[in-house]
């Protein structure tokens, strides 16, 4: 430490150490496509629930698709997430931890985030909004809101609430 401020090297070491200590997801399976470099991650949460995330490399930057719930209660016929029912909502930190874990494993920066993995994001509204604020914070990953997409099966009251938040995100409606 130099005076009351940490030197840059100490700050970087501290951030890496904290990231290793605080991640609440454990990789239980990783599948890599030999065709395009896509990686599917199966994570176990601290309570034993399992979720999935996907890393997708593109020329314009890397995208990650994350889960917002362990399971889902929406019952969409086109989606496998509903088969196990809803176990629980993920916290904002658990959503963020999927990105931190993938970034650390892949050794590459994530520039785009899609909330379209396991679960219905708008059914976990408060944690979704908290996650977006944390993700875009300049002291965190500082990902632009314009690089975030939220996909929903269409919970109308929450769609209006999300619009009122003033986020500059992309909203996708799954039909």
Tell me the role of every PLM-derived stretch:
Residues 9-13:
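Extended basic (Lys/Arg/His-rich) segments that typically form rRNA-contacting surfaces
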Residues 1-7:
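Short, small-residue-biased leader/transition segments that mark boundaries at the very start
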Residues 53-169:
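Conserved Radical SAM active-site core
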Residues 4, 14-15, 131-135:
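A broad, low-specificity signal for short, low-complexity segments enriched in glycine/proline
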Residues 14-59:
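Long amphipathic N-terminal alpha/beta scaffold segment
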Residues 8, 28-31, 62-65:
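Short gly/ser-rich anion-binding loops that grip negatively charged ligand groups
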């Amino acid at each position: 430490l130099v005076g009351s401020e940490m030197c840059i090297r100490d700050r970087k070491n501290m951030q890496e150490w904290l990231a290793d200590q605080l991640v609440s997801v454990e990789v239980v399976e990783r599948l890599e496509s030999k065709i395009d470099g896509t990686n599917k991650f199966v994570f176990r949460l601290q309570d034993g629930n399992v979720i999935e995330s996907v890393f997708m490399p593109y020329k314009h930057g890397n995208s990650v698709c994350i889960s917002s719930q362990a399971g889902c209660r929406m019952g969409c016929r086109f989606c496998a997430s509903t088969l196990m029912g809803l176990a629980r909502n993920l916290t904002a930190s658990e959503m963020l931890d999927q990105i931190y874990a993938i970034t650390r494993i892949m050794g590459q920066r994530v520039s785009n985030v899609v909330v379209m993995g396991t679960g219905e994001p708008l059914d976990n509204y408060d944690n979704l909004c908290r996650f977006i604020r944390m993700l875009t914070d300049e002291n965190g990953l500082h990902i632009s809101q314009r690089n975030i997409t939220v996909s929903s099966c269409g919970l109308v009251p929450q769609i209006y609430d999300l619009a009122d938040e003033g986020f500059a995100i992309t909203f996708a409606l799954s039909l």
